Every structure is written in structure tokens, then in C-alpha cells.
From Swiss-Prot:
The chain crosses the membrane at residues 30-50, 189-209, 218-238. It is a multi-pass membrane protein. One of its GO terms (cellular component) is plasma membrane. Keywords: Cell membrane, Membrane, Plasmid, Transmembrane, Transmembrane helix. This is Uncharacterized protein aq_aa23. It comes from Aquifex aeolicus (strain VF5). It is found in: Cell membrane. Its main location: membrane.
Length: 271
């Protein structure tokens, strides 16, 4: 088999993915995660709009010192940021702050330990970008692009792994590990959602106890809760897609590619 034939066979393998999507669209119900993604994104964006609809109601200097230190980022004189993630000051020139958002971020610190563990591995779901619209877009894109991204990265690294002496059985183990890692990410993403909801509950309880539960508090707690609750159907949609497709057809495609690499000198195409 010459290089031209090898290249053609490799390309054919990679082309099976989009072909499978279109040919078996109704058979495998691939519409389900796409619809879930659209609805969940809409709910999350609505929650985000509620969050940002809250009006500044407290002078920043009047908040307790420890809350100010937590809810602001040092060295930024123009705008205060909640832990450097997203702005909670609408009118920085007047020194006004949404108190509910500041208390919300304070409770995040109480849940800091699980957040530190889970946040790095849930970036694809909970990306802390300056604007949450991009976050929802990221989630939706991942809903319709399951773990094939990881599979493709492993496949593309096959010639390199072979060159360094990795056996076929070890590559299968790597493939299995990648599948387990993605499942672990789903679990961590759910844990991060639960952590956010606990923060919102704690914030609401704080304002109820202090008899200061007003419209702003409602907008912040309900808006933030909706944003994160929308992650749950998104995550389950991804898991559903993987169980119905990626763990079957996708892994089979990966195994075919592995067989091809180890049967031929495919590495010569890359080096």
C-alpha cells in the first residue's frame, strides 16, 4: 500500500463521522441533544439577563471588609469584579454595587474547596468567560460535538505513539482511559452545578434571615440558578449522545484507525 492509498483510507475513516450523523439522524435520535442544547441555552441566557437586570443598591464601602476583599479584585480601580470572573458593579464611577452579587461571591469562598477541584476539569461546561453568552454558546457546541474531539486527538497522535514504541494494547487502554475521563468530566460538571446552586440557596437564606430579600436579591439568586440549572440537561444530553453513539460507532472507528496504523508504516506520512 503506497502513501496515496494510505492517505485515501485515512480520509475515508474520518469521513465516516459526518456521514453517520446524516444517514442515521432519525434512527439514533440525534435531534434530541440538539433540541435540548437549544432550549437549555435559551433558559441559561434568560437567567443571565435576570442576573444583570439587578440594579446597584449598595455603596461598596459600606459592605463588611471581608466581603469587599472577596467580592473585588485588587488593583482594578475602574470596575470591581466578582473574584475576577464577571463584573458585579454596574455604575463603578458612583461606587455602587449589587449587594446580592457580592454576598453571592462571598458564599462561593465557603464552597471554595470543591470549586477549586472541579472547576479546572469542567471548563468545557463552566467556562468562566467575561460574558456568559459565550459560556452558553460553548455548552451548546459541545452538546452537538461529543467526545469525538478527544478520540480524534488520540487518533492523530497514533503515529507518534507508535514511533515511541507504544503497543496496540496500550493504545486501546489509552482510548478507554479517554472515555472514562470524559465521563469523569460530566460528573465534575454536575458537582460544579450543585455547588453553584448551594451558593444561591445560602445567599437567599442570608437575605431572608436579615429581612433584606428584595427584588435585586431575587434577580441575582434566581437568574444565577437558572443559568446553572440549564447546565444539567446539557450535561445529560452529552452523556446520552455518548452512550448512543460515541461509545459504539465512534470507538469502533477509532479501533479501525489503530489497526491501520499498526498494520502499516503510517508514521511515514507524518515524519
Amino acid at each position: 500500500m503506497n502513501s496515496k492509498e494510505l492517505t485515501k483510507e485515512v480520509l475515508n475513516l474520518f469521513q465516516t463521522l459526518p456521514e453517520f450523523y446524516f444517514e442515521h439522524f432519525h434512527e439514533y435520535g440525534i435531534w434530541f441533544p440538539i433540541v435540548v442544547g437549544i432550549i437549555a441555552s435559551a433558559v441559561g441566557m434568560f437567567g443571565m439577563l435576570l442576573f444583570y437586570a439587578a440594579e446597584p443598591d449598595t455603596e461598596f464601602e459600606k459592605l463588611p471588609f471581608f466581603v469587599r476583599k472577596i467580592a473585588s479584585r485588587e488593583g482594578d480601580e475602574d470596575t470591581y469584579f466578582a473574584l475576577g470572573i464577571y463584573p458585579i458593579i454596574i455604575l463603578p464611577a458612583e461606587g455602587k454595587i449589587i449587594k446580592a452579587a457580592a454576598i453571592h461571591e462571598f458564599f462561593h469562598v465557603l464552597f471554595k474547596f470543591p470549586w477549586v477541584i472541579f472547576q479546572p476539569v469542567t471548563g468545557i461546561f463552566m467556562t468562566q468567560l467575561p460574558y456568559r453568552f459565550f459560556n452558553m454558546l460553548t455548552q451548546f457546541l459541545y452538546t452537538v460535538l461529543p467526545k469525538h474531539i478527544v478520540l480524534m486527538l488520540i487518533l492523530l497522535s497514533m503515529p507518534i505513539l507508535k514511533k515511541f514504541g507504544m503497543e496496540k494494547s496500550q493504545v486501546y487502554e489509552l482510548l478507554s482511559l479517554a472515555s472514562k475521563y470524559i465521563t469523569f468530566v460530566y460528573i465534575c460538571a454536575l458537582a460544579a452545578v450543585i455547588e453553584e446552586l448551594l451558593v444561591n440557596i445560602a445567599t437567599a437564606i442570608y437575605f431572608l434571615i436579615t429581612f433584606k430579600f428584595n427584588e435585586n436579591t431575587f434577580l441575582v439568586t434566581v437568574g444565577s440558578s437558572l443559568t446553572y440549572l440549564s447546565n444539567i440537561p446539557m450535561i445529560f444530553a452529552c452523556m446520552w449522545m455518548d452512550f448512543h453513539y460515541a461509545d459504539g460507532q465512534g470507538v469502533e472507528m477509532a479501533k479501525k484507525f489503530i489497526e491501520l496504523v499498526f498494520k502499516t508504516e503510517l508514521s511515514s506520512l507524518f515524519f
